[in-house]
Amino acid sequence: MTSETSVNLLDFDAEGLVAYCGSLGEKPFRAKQLQRWIHQYNAGDFDGMTDLAKSLREKLKGRASIVMPDIASDHVSTDGTRKWLIDVGNGNAVETVFIPEETRGTLCVSSQAGCAVNCRFCSTGKQGFSRNLSTAEIIGQLRMAEFALRASLGRAPGPNGKAERVVTNVVMMGMGEPLLNYSAVVPAMRLMLDDNAYGLSRRRVTLSTSGVVPMMDRLGAELPVALAVSLHAPNDALRDELVPLNKKYPLRELMAACQRYLKVAPRDFITFEYCMLDGVNDTEAHARELLAVTRDVPCKFNLIPFNPFPESGLIRSKPEQIKRFAQVLIDAGVVTTVRKTRGDDIDAACGQLAGAVKDRTRLAERTGAAGKIIEVRAV
């Protein structure tokens, strides 16, 4: 544990670290050195930072720390998907998932413990909202995953270029609504993009939002990365039921915001995510309606087979119905993919493991036991 006055350096992007070093009487280049040690060499303390002046290392030892999130469990699926459960205190946990593919490795990162948006089909929303994650807790997920994966492959830490990097893409699609934690998410994404940290391109960092229109505009002005929008319905009446935020920012406003974002986006399309729910939003008529509502937004569709959980009362669309729905979109000339289900054997659907932790914690509170996260592993 660190002292109450200790500063966690993982909370700083480049600008913040320069300012912090300045407060110690140090020049800006020291911040770059420090950032490389932390994010490229995986340094956990200051003694090994040999190109820093000893006087600076001593200053840092008394004032700063590098504190990573605590890993509660680490699960590896038979298909190679790897999922970490991160303990963020007070019985709360978030999830980080790595999805390996032949030409890339994608890390799905969480931004909040729980979620206040409360989409009907999302198990995270049913847990309620606990708190925003800090920048350190967000970028810490990438730092933890990158170096754990490198170690498993026998690759040493260090800025060894793209050939050595395991995580090639980051998607802010884990637990929480990223744009409702803007002040912590944006510095974390700046570190993802920084050549003195993880060096990802803007095209390889994707933020997924349920449609917080004012913050979409702000993101476009300040840090336009690739954008995905959780759409899930082709009209306001249905989307009001599935995504309650739609009552505040209806489809007309959302589509206009998407058009504005595309003027500055690193990609020339928006990805619309669409959870396929049997008998709710999956008819061919819904698909045609979807084409109409998105007609002025260059886009592609990512159809997501629903991951059932007991409280939802919803059922996954049948494979043949998903295929028919997709064909309507494809026939209209829109690129459409169906998300492949990954990591079923380790509950890799977002929110499932953390939801189990939440349930155990609530049970412990009722029975008077300590609310400690219990490690569980796939067998």
UniProtKB/Swiss-Prot annotation:
Residues 101-345 form the Radical SAM core domain. GO terms for biological process: rRNA base methylation; tRNA methylation. [4Fe-4S] cluster binds at residues 115, 119, 122. One of its GO terms (molecular function) is rRNA (adenine(2503)-C2-)-methyltransferase activity. Binds 1 [4Fe-4S] cluster. The cluster is coordinated with 3 cysteines and an exchangeable S-adenosyl-L-methionine. The active site is at residues 95, 350. Its main location: cytoplasm. InterPro entries: Aldolase_TIM (IPR013785), Methyltransferase_A (IPR040072), RlmN_N (IPR048641), RNA_MTrfase_RlmN (IPR027492), rRNA_lsu_MTrfase_RlmN/Cfr (IPR004383), rSAM (IPR007197). Its EC number is 2.1.1.192. It is an enzyme of class 2 (transferase). Keywords: 4Fe-4S, Cytoplasm, Disulfide bond, Iron, Iron-sulfur, Metal-binding, Methyltransferase, rRNA processing, S-adenosyl-L-methionine, Transferase, tRNA processing. Disulfide bonds join 108-350. GO terms for cellular component: cytoplasm. It holds the Pfam family Radical_SAM. Specifically methylates position 2 of adenine 2503 in 23S rRNA and position 2 of adenine 37 in tRNAs. m2A2503 modification seems to play a crucial role in the proofreading step occurring at the peptidyl transferase center and thus would serve to optimize ribosomal fidelity. Belongs to the radical SAM superfamily. RlmN family. HAMAP family: RNA_methyltr_RlmN (MF_01849). This is Dual-specificity RNA methyltransferase RlmN.
